């Protein structure tokens, strides 16, 4: 994996440390150092990891964060939070505030930064305004946002710029991908597409990032059909070179649009 990422042109790998990921949470102390060593040997960095961490008092979650910090990982993406049945949204948001605040205090002790991804749908933080609210009491140096423009446009439509204006001081990592609305059997659904071929106005978005002077790590996501690679499958149904070609194509397109913005 590391050698392929280097050959494609990436300068780092966003490792998944979660069930069915590159590293299993319960094996983080044994396997994360090995994975990071392989990445380092390929000339790449491990600046960030993607996790299911969500509770500062959970032993496995704490161990993931502590191990990552010891290995000098700078950022981790935490798990998404779900609105519980039987509670009003304001009540649930009070609990979410405490969750992020507690994690931010753990992060501060360990000198690592946690990030919450805005994800479209019914998860907490789908709306940028929601996310801004639940971050209010956290230590903002050590807890922020993995801002995902694809999900922001799905939820924000034409008002995504307002959300970015609001949340940009809290952005720690960027996640980028693209989509279209597609009619499937009479129902309109979100369909992931190759970078730059969808509804995200990347030139306007990148221009705003430059205006805000946002210089943070970027994770390029591949979620359109790639023979199972898009879903993290251990075996895929298309030749791996086809996957690598799409990955390089998207990376070059990202770099091109950034330069043009």
Where are these regions (language model features)?
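Histidine-acidic metal/acid-base catalytic patches
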Residues: 1-11, 128-143, 147, 153-261
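Active-site acidic/histidine proton-transfer and metal-coordination neighborhood
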Residues: 2-3, 19, 38, 53-145, ...
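Structural preference for beta-strand elements that scaffold enzyme active sites
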Residues: 12-14, 45-50, 74-77, 111-115, ...
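Glycine-rich, proline-tolerant flexible connector loops at the mouths of alpha/beta enzymes
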Residues: 14-37, 87
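Residues that line or immediately flank small-molecule/substrate-binding pockets and catalytic motifs
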Residues: 17, 53, 80-83, 171, ...
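Residue-level marker for beta-strand->alpha-helix junctions and adjacent short loops that shape enzyme
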Residues: 18-20, 56, 83, 121, ...
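A short acidic, helix-capping loop that chelates divalent metal ions and anchors anionic groups
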Residues: 19-24, 84-89, 155, 184, ...
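Short, structured active-site "lid" loops
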Residues: 38-45
């Amino acid at each position: 994996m590391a050698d392929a990422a280097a050959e494609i042109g990436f300068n780092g790998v966003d490792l998944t440390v979660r069930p069915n990921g590159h590293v299993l949470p319960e094996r983080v102390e044994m396997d994360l150092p090995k994975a990071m060593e392989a990445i380092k040997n390929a000339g790449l960095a491990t600046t960030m990891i993607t996790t299911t961490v969500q509770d500062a008092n959970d032993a496995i979650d704490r161990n993931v964060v502590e191990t990552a910090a010891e290995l000098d990982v700078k950022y981790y993406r935490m798990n998404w939070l779900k609105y519980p049945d039987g509670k009003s949204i304001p009540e649930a948001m009070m609990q979410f505030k405490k969750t992020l605040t507690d994690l931010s205090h753990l992060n501060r002790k360990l000198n690592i930064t946690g990030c919450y991804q805005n994800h479209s749908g019914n998860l907490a933080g789908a709306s940028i305004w929601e996310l801004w609210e639940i971050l209010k009491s956290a230590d903002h140096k050590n807890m922020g946002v993995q801002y995902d423009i694809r999900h922001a446009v799905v939820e924000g439509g034409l008002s995504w710029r307002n959300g970015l204006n609001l949340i940009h001081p809290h952005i720690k990592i960027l996640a980028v991908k693209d989509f279209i609305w597609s009619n499937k059997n009479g129902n309109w659904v979100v369909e992931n597409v190759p970078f730059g071929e969808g509804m995200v106005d990347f030139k306007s978005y990148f221009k705003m990032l430059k205006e805000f002077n946002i210089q943070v790590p970027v994770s390029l996501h591949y979620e359109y059909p790639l023979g199972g690679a898009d879903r993290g499958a251990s075996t895929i149904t298309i030749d791996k070179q086809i996957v690598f070609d799409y990955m390089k194509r998207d990376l070059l397109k990202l770099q091109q649009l950034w330069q043009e913005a």
